[in-house]
Amino acid sequence: VRLSDEQLLQLRFCDLQLKLSGSALERRLQHIYGELQRRGIGLRPHMWLAEEWFSPDGIPGIAVPFYLAHPRLMQLERHQMKQVEGGNANWLRRILRHEAGHAMDTAYRLRYRRAWREVFGPPGKPYPDIYMARPASRRYVHHLGDWYAQSHPTEDFAETFAVWLKPHSDWRRTYAGWPAYDKLLFVDELMQSLRDVPPLVRSRVHVEPLGDNRITLADHYAAKVARYGQYPPSDADALLRRVFTCRPARVAAPRASALLRECRTSVATAVALETGVDRYTVHQALRRAIGRCDELQLRVRGARRTGLRDARTMLVKLVGLLATNRVTSIKL
């Protein structure tokens, strides 16, 4: 029986009766094991279903969000959050490499090494609710969105590890001349020293597993939307309102966010070439524009071709704002 969104939201996580073992999702997740093996790393992080992505302190494993276990739940996630984190193969592997970095840190107690702390900073530093990112900084790698490596020393390590682990990663050329290069070189040398070394921490505990979770999906999404669902007002709003519209007469027009999502690759590539700004920053600008278009309920003003042209012009200006902005605040 296919349940409506309203019916699904009334269920508790434990009512979903989802299983990872033997599933198609498990086979997709295990791709990370091959990447680790090719690097000579003996760790195989165990995985389990939970509310969200995380790798718990003290446990060298990876919690995987429940919605990836079923297409209908992925659809619900998209309806609620406008996106599915890890919902395609490339995004899934990027997240897994990041979480594998956390698992490596735990399994080999890396953060307790003096050299690690000298490179990445104090691991005991409190996690901020909001971190101040510097988009133009070259002291950090670019992997997940929102300059995530800048949020905390342990995230800096996990992001650096992820860039290093990626198959055919050309990090030596990409980051040549960046201070972040020294971090990658440190990770490369550290991982070479750990080749075929068994993990020190081998716990296989599942933290906050889905089967024990009695929270309803409605409560889960209410909290998640409150925390992540809104992009704050920004300098971009004036640009977006100039290109798109929220006039009642255009309610039947395509959503601006849908247009930007549809053409994101081609527009981002063109803008990166035109401005000379790195593709990572361009994609962050576009992602934020899409989020604000959703919040402001903006629509395409005229013909689709005109909308695409104006969107490209808008993104060029928005990238300029972001690239020259010394600090931008981001909610964790």
Predicted feature residues:
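Pan-zinc metallopeptidase signature
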Residues: 1-3, 8-11, 157-331
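Metalloprotease/metallohydrolase-associated module, dominated by Zn2+-dependent proteases
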Residues: 2-7, 11-20, 27-36, 40-45, ...
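A structural signal for short, well-ordered beta-strand segments and their strand-loop junctions
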Residues: 46-48, 105
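Active-site recognition of the HExxH zinc-binding catalytic motif
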Residues: 90-110, 158
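A short linear boundary/processing microfeature
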Residues: 110-111, 122
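Beta-strand-dominated extracellular/periplasmic modules and repeats
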Residues: 114-115
